[in-house]
Design a protein with these regions (language model features):
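Asp-based, Mg2+/Mn2+-dependent phosphohydrolase catalytic module
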Residues: 99, 103-199
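Helix-loop "lid/cap" segments that line or gate small-molecule binding pockets
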Residues: 10-14, 35-49, 105
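Conserved donor sugar-nucleotide recognition element shared by glycan-biosynthetic enzymes
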Residues: 5, 36, 74, 128
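Short, acidic loop-to-helix structural element flanking the phosphoryl-transfer center
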Residues: 65-93, 103, 129
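Metal-dependent phosphoesterase signature
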Residues: 41-79
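Conserved phosphate-coupling serine/threonine residues in phosphotransfer and NTP-handling enzymes
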Residues: 95-97
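Active-site neighborhood of HAD-like aspartate-dependent phosphohydrolases
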Residues: 1-26
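Short helix-capping segments at alpha-helix termini
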Residues: 15-21, 47-51, 110-114
Length: 199
């Protein structure tokens, strides 16, 4: 959804007299996986932090409204793969997004039926590693694996004590060799190698 989010954030920023910043899809891809505070520092370095966060909250509000109407761009065969995964594994989402983003995405694309639970810092105020731990504890998981695409995801998995699969088709790289997949359709086999079948 990076292109859609870029459009919505640019609309929000256009209404703010403090900045003439516009956001591209490439910008958004570089921000993916980062907390809102970090994005504010990167995107609006000339603006003092409290005002930067106020502007980011405006971006969030416009983004939610935009995504409710337009959704995001899905990976090819995403729903088919989610269905296949959900037959063997319980699926969860842990993301560094704001509160409401996951719900909006799942509702627009009618994908909620494949997921058991989700968490984000917008809901807890906590970092990704803590939110991974919350999901594991809240759902009484004795085995889990986290699929992510950037170094911060690997760091969060390490901190939470959860194995990691690098989604190499995503937005970033990681600093060491870990199990990796080149497309979403490879996640099932990678998870099965780490977890076995959980259902």
């Amino acid at each position: 959804s990076s292109e859609q989010v870029a459009v919505s954030w640019s609309r929000a920023l256009a209404s703010r007299p403090e900045t003439d910043r516009q956001v591209t899809g490439e910008d958004m891809r570089s921000y993916m996986g980062k907390t809102l505070e970090t994005i504010a520092e990167l995107m609006l370095p000339e603006i003092e932090p409290a005002l930067g966060m106020e502007i980011m909250r405006d971006c969030e509000r416009v983004e939610q409204d935009y995504l409710i109407e337009h959704g995001g761009t899905l990976f090819p065969n995403l729903e088919k793969e989610l269905e296949r995964l959900s037959k063997s594994f319980s699926l969860f989402i842990v993301s560094n997004c704001q509160s409401g983003y996951i719900e909006t995405f799942l509702e627009y694309h009618k994908l909620g039926k494949y997921f058991t639970d989700f968490e984000c810092p917008g809901g807890t105020g906590l970092a990704k590693a803590d939110n991974i731990r919350i999901i594991v504890e809240r759902n009484n998981l004795d085995r889990a694996v986290y699929v992510g695409d950037i170094q911060g995801d690997l760091d969060a998995s390490d901190s939470a004590g959860v194995p990691f699969i690098h989604a190499a088709y995503g937005f970033g790289t990681v600093n060491r060799d870990v199990p990796a997949v080149k497309s979403f359709s490879e996640v099932f086999e990678a998870a099965e190698r780490i977890l076995g079948s959980t259902r």
